């Protein structure tokens, strides 16, 4: 078990290389042209910043000093 305490980082690197190879292999199977052709429509985005628009504290441009 002495070797494990010295060379644990090699096992981590082997694990990360395996994960990386599996990700590359899975990404090769994705057909991006088919996905883009049948892309679903996104619903309209609603943010909650519209209530801040009413609290406009900016000075008016045509005010005289």
Curated annotation (Swiss-Prot):
Cysteine-cysteine disulfides: none
Transmembrane segments: 4-24
Compositionally biased spans, kind Basic and acidic residues: 42-65
Record GO cellular component, one term: plasma membrane
Pfam families assigned to the protein according to its UniProt record, in alphabetical order: UPF0370
Intracellular or extracellular location(s): Cell membrane
Protein topology in the membrane: Single-pass membrane protein
Signal peptide: none
UniProt entry keywords in alphabetical sequence: Cell membrane, Membrane, Transmembrane, Transmembrane helix
Region (Disordered): 39-65
Main location: membrane
HAMAP family registered for this protein in UniProt: UPF0370
NCBIfam families, alphabetized: PRK13664.1
Family: Belongs to the UPF0370 family.
Protein's name in the database: UPF0370 protein Ent638_2968
Source species of the chain: Enterobacter sp. (strain 638)
């Amino acid at each position: 078990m002495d070797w494990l305490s010295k060379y644990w980082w090699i096992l981590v690197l082997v694990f990360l290389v395996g994960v990386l190879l599996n990700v590359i292999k899975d990404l090769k199977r994705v057909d991006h042209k088919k996905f883009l052709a049948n892309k679903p429509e996104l619903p309209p985005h609603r943010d909650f910043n519209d209530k801040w628009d009413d609290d406009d504290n900016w000075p008016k441009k045509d005010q005289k000093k």
